[in-house]
Amino acid sequence: MPQLQGLNHLLFSVSDLEKSFCFYRDVLHAKPLVRGRKLAYFDLNGYWLALNEEPDIPRNEIAHSYTHMAFTITEESFDEWYAHLEKHGVTILHGRDRSERDKRSIYFIDPDGHKFELHTGTLQDRLAYYRDEKHHMTFFE
């Protein structure tokens, strides 16, 4: 049976990136890592915290949000995990199109519609990709 490798990252959908950026930085003392037009990444005491700005969705409609919890899996266990989810009748969602440098993910929902992700990449992989490809972003280190 496949095993989870640990928590990968937390992502929250926010209606106002500036307001949320200040809250997580100033109130929770999260350390800013990168900020783009619609996203920001923090180190929250060793945890990768991501904010995605989604201003036009109802805040009470979870099904419309990209907000999710992601767990780390190995690249080698990716297919095993996919088969495991299918075997248990889990609803697997079509993930966003992404570069190979952004690694691989399986998105799925629980019976109440809460989104989860099994991800093979790391924060360092993502930041390296963004540094090379996303020139509009501001990096803090």
UniProtKB/Swiss-Prot annotation:
Active site, per annotation: 117 (proton donor/acceptor)
Cofactor(s) in the UniProt record: Mg(2+)
GO cellular component terms, semicolon-separated: cytoplasm
Keyword presence, Metal-binding: yes
Amino acids binding Mg(2+): 9, 68, 117
GO molecular function: magnesium ion binding; transferase activity, transferring alkyl or aryl (other than methyl) groups
Catalytic activity, EC: 2.5.1.-
Transmembrane regions listed in the UniProt entry: none
Subcellular location, principal: cytoplasm
Domain called VOC: residue spans: 6-121
Compartments reported by the entry: Cytoplasm
Enzyme class: transferase
UniProt xrefs under InterPro entries: Fosfomycin_Res_Enzymes (IPR051332), Glyas_Bleomycin-R_OHBP_Dase (IPR029068), Glyas_Fos-R_dOase_dom (IPR004360), Metallothiol_Trafse_FosB (IPR022858), VOC (IPR037523)
Positions of disulphide bridges: none
Function of the protein: Metallothiol transferase which confers resistance to fosfomycin by catalyzing the addition of a thiol cofactor to fosfomycin. L-cysteine is probably the physiological thiol donor.
Quaternary structure annotation from Swiss-Prot or TrEMBL: Homodimer.
Protein family (similarity comment): Belongs to the fosfomycin resistance protein family. FosB subfamily.
HAMAP family: FosB
Protein name: Metallothiol transferase FosB
Organism listed in the record: Brevibacillus brevis (strain 47 / JCM 6285 / NBRC 100599)
